[in-house]
């Protein structure tokens, strides 16, 4: 993902960049997520925690015969007992609240360790051509097919679950659950997010849900590129964000999933260089479809 921005800003690298990565391009099949009418969320859905609540009680300690145990002064010995209320596993899925669905998903992300799931595929592709103003626009039109090929060849196998198990109710547009018998599927759509050149890759709705590019410096340094001017005109908008995760009821881990967004790259007015090459970029735009399927 972090090579994408550098590729777009250093257009002369496209042909050489296309030569790296796997020789065989792997196609993946994604399934559109259709939300039901009652899947939309509002603030009231997440006012209370979905984690199982605990109750405590002070009780007298008894011996094997049921007699109350006393101390040296004759006072009854007591202890604090902590018990959890009904867990999600004991509650019918059809009765889960939206907060409980989100809690179950976050816990599944945390529980699912690398190597526990089948290897999937991380894919990148252009969603439309690369465009720009002036002379650079015609160059971009020619290079778009090569960029598409470069992105495809840098799509890689993965057994990594995106996200960190920290998704919040306020990040969601909608959430729903489907009972499959031995598994259940949680589907979510996530709010869009726009970042500047110095963002935190774990911050914001999309950062918490999947992860973003973050600061552009890593991408620039990786390919030896830099901005001479106009760095502040760079923005990345993450849109069409969705998650589907199938979770095993017994283990609480993710067995299959799909994570998706389109990142809309904009360079408003900047001068970028790589090695001895420099390009003036004005209103450079590219939409990149990013998908992980496990």
Predicted feature residues:
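Subset-of-secretome marker
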Residues: 24-27, 32-60, 66-69, 74-294
């Amino acid at each position: 993902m972090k090579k994408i921005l550098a590729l777009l800003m250093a257009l002369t690298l496209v042909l050489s960049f296309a030569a790296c990565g796997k020789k065989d391009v792997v196609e993946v099949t994604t399934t559109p997520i259709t939300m039901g009418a009652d899947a939309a969320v509002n603030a009231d859905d997440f006012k209370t925690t979905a984690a199982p609540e605990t109750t405590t009680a002070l009780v007298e300690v008894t011996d094997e015969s049921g007699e109350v145990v006393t101390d040296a002064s004759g006072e009854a010995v007591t202890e604090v007992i902590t018990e959890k209320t009904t867990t999600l596993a004991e509650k019918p899925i059809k009765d889960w609240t939206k907060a409980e669905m989100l809690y179950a998903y976050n816990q599944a992300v945390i529980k699912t360790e690398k190597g526990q799931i089948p290897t999937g595929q991380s894919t990148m592709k252009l969603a439309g051509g690369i465009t720009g103003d002036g002379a650079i626009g015609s160059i971009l039109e020619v290079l778009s097919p090569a960029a598409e090929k470069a992105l495809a060849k840098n799509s890689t196998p993965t057994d990594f679950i995106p996200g960190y198990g920290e998704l919040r109710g306020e990040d969601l547009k909608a959430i729903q659950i489907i009972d499959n018998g031995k598994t259940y599927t949680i589907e979510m759509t996530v709010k869009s997010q726009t970042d500047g050149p110095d963002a935190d890759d774990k911050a914001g709705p999309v950062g918490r849900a999947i992860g973003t590019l973050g600061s552009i410096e890593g991408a620039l340094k990786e390919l030896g590129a830099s901005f001479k001017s106009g760095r502040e005109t760079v923005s990345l908008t993450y849109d069409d964000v969705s998650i589907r995760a199938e979770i095993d009821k017994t283990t609480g881990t993710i067995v299959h999933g799909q994570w998706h967004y389109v990142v809309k790259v904009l360079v408003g007015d900047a001068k970028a260089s790589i090695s001895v090459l420099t390009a003036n970029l004005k209103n450079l735009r590219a939409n990149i479809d990013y998908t992980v399927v496990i």
